[in-house]
Amino acid sequence: MEALGDVAETADLLRYSCSRMEANEGFAIELGRDPLTGFESSNVSVLRPYGVWVVISPFNFPAALTGGPLGAALVAGNTVVFKPATDTPWTSRLIAECLRDAGIPDGVYNFVTGPGSTLGQAIIESPQVDGITFTGSYDVGMKIYRDFGSGRWVRPTILELGGKNPAIVSRHANLEDAAVGIVRSAFGLQGQKCSACSRVFIEEPVYDQLVGRIVELTNKLAIGDPTDRQVYLGPVVNKNSYRDYQQFSEDLHQNSRILTGGKVLLDGMYSKGYFCTPTIAVDLPAGHKLWQQEMFVPITTIAKVKNLDEAMVRANNVEYGLTAGFYGAPEETDWFFDNIQAGVTYANRPQGATTGAWPGFQPFGGWKGSGSSGKNSGGPHYVQLYMHEQIHTLVRHA
């Protein structure tokens, strides 16, 4: 099911970039005319492509997180080199075939695959590269940012990095909406989304009731073959993620109270993949590292708070600022939007507390350690990131 959305969103991202270029008439804007005696002047702002743009995409949405930046870069007039994650190269290969079949000339798009430590590093270090978009982990993104900035001049770097995404629940919330939205965001795609809900802060008066409902819904989630539409969780992507889940679970068993999950599945069909149970942990000390660290597996920690101000302080007390959700009274939502430090924010959304992005509806991007550009993918300001401005001033004798 996630793959169906990934492909559909890719098509819409490509259409959206094209529509923004057309709606803005190529981003050529006539400016003021200088008041020069005896002369006529004109000034025009134009946006021009940078040249060669690199797109490095992650495994979790290999179509949309390749096609989105690739499409924007191409529409802006750049040539593109794109390298997928080593776990999911075939999806990007299919995108390359679609571009070929659409008639885009050879050399305008260039699909390459290989390890990030060798091929990826060589691309980043190439002086022929004029800009880069990387979607992935904070640590790798920051290394790319530093390495890419060590050339002869400053080159644009668009980073879409991780998240440690909170949901805040007020005592005035619709608790069923909150429970459904939190579970969907925490465990969709096995928690392997940068937008996954990994932290929940609940006001004390509704804490017990809501936690009970979250656990109840979590226990109903089907785990198995991800091609079966009745299944909600498939396996995590690889052995490293499997080991991460086991290490985090062991830590939580020692330092928190696990209400459900906290173990891998080994019997029967589960022996054929990296299957993990969706995990809810409570009573984790506020200073514990797992409140800060992006886990990227199906684990969510929940805390009781005395009031919304405490919840907001804890929600913002991380290096990340990607997505965030809130459940409460309508009059409380402005407070949430005004104070939360995140690029994509949701209020009273049962479809997902912290997840859900679509071009032209919920453009996707982060603040702080979650993103570098300040402009969200699939939004009205995104395609411009792949161009630089040039001013044309022309003066004629009157």
List where the protein language model places each region.
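Conserved residues at the C-terminal ends of beta-strands
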Residues: 20, 56, 115, 135, ...
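Generic, well-ordered alpha-helical scaffold segments in large soluble proteins
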Residues: 13-20, 56, 73, 98, ...
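Conserved C-terminal structural/oligomerization subdomain of aldehyde/semialdehyde dehydrogenase
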Residues: 104, 128-129, 168, 222-226, ...
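Residue-level detector of anion-binding/catalytic polar loops
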Residues: 79, 257-258, 321
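ALDH superfamily catalytic-core signature
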Residues: 103, 125, 131, 139-285, ...
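Catalytic cores of nucleotide-enabled group-transfer and carboxylate-activating enzymes in metabolic
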Residues: 4-5, 13-16, 362
